[in-house]
């Protein structure tokens, strides 16, 4: 099974036996770029066009996080940083990626990157990209500060009753794309991915507390923070917090852009991410 942009479907096994599905495309000899999506999304969120553009430059590995997309949705494990770290490590191991990889995380994917680095270190990683991302989670964690659309959606977004969930998630409006003309199709596709994620998984991802500030202060690889100033899902202050903590981090704050900069302006996104990735050593 495959799609033209996303590549063949492959599978790795996490430390608890969970099957993690991912797709690979691009030159096998190119630098690996591992894409980790956000809460209640899947690897489909990146869109065929952006995946095709990225895969013309890199070996793109687009992962479905546990509980999302085609990956297994176990009953437990969502509150354990080591389990999340193990999922990423399993994909890297399955692809024999031992050095030079770039991890790019959108939204909750940024937290998963930090989980991985906290457990496995940076030996296999050349750099990280945090896109509208959280790096910590829990009450009082500056790296996990959510925006007004996310606050409005909780707790209804976790409900099993469809009418409640749809109404709550509808409060996102255009948050994932921004009020960009002509993005209605993309907005509905992302909304569909959210609804297709099991309610118990939507809830479980918030049911943990972890702080990664110390990890970021001591990060020994380059990092690039990309965040919309009008992000209503993950407040821009969370991105600024990460950029301030990480030694030498680069940052790009997109004025007036909401939670999905790669949807709002894929060409600009491709350019900025490529500039960072192409400037890395190793």
Summary of predicted features, one role per range:
Residues 15, 23, 62-104, 108, ...:
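Active-site loop/oxyanion-hole signature of alpha/beta-hydrolase fold enzymes
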Residues 232-238:
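Conserved alpha/beta-hydrolase "acid-adjacent" motif
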Residues 257-270:
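Catalytic histidine-centered segment of alpha/beta-hydrolase-like enzymes
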Residues 140-145, 159-218:
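Conserved alpha/beta-hydrolase catalytic His-Asp/Glu region
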Residues 219, 225-227, 231:
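Short beta-strand/loop motif that positions the catalytic acidic residue
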Residues 114-159:
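Flexible "cap/lid" loop of the alpha/beta hydrolase fold
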Residues 37-39, 105-110, 228:
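Conserved alpha/beta-hydrolase "nucleophile elbow" surrounding the catalytic nucleophile
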């Amino acid at each position: 099974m495959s799609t033209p942009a996303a590549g063949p479907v492959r599978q790795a096994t996490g430390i608890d036996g969970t099957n993690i599905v991912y797709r690979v495309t691009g030159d096998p000899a190119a630098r690996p770029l591992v894409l980790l999506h956000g809460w209640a999304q899947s690897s489909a969120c990146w869109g065929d066009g952006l995946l095709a553009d990225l895969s013309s430059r890199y070996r793109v590995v687009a992962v479905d996080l546990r509980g999302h997309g085609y990956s297994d949705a176990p009953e437990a494990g969502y509150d354990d940083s080591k389990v999340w770290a193990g999922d990423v490590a399993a994909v890297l191991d399955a692809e024999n990626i031992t050095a030079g990889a770039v991890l790019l995380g959108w939204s909750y994917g940024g937290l998963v990157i930090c989980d991985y680095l906290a457990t496995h270190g940076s030996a296999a990683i050349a750099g990280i990209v945090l896109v509208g991302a959280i790096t910590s989670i829990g009450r009082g964690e500056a790296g996990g500060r959510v925006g007004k659309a996310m606050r409005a959606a909780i707790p209804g977004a976790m409900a099993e009753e469809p009418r409640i969930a749809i109404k709550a998630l509808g409060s996102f409006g255009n948050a994932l794309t921004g009020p960009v003309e002509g993005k209605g199709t993309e907005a509905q596709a992302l909304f569909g991915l959210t609804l297709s994620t099991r309610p118990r998984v939507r809830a479980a991802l918030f049911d943990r507390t972890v702080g990664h500030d110390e990890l970021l202060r001591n990060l020994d690889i380059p990092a690039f923070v990309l965040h919309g100033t009008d992000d209503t899902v993950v407040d821009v202050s969370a991105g600024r917090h990460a950029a301030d903590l990480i030694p030498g981090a680069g940052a790009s704050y997109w004025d007036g852009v909401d939670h999905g900069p790669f949807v709002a302006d894929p060409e600009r996104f491709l350019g900025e991410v490529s500039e960072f990735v192409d400037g890395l050593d190793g």
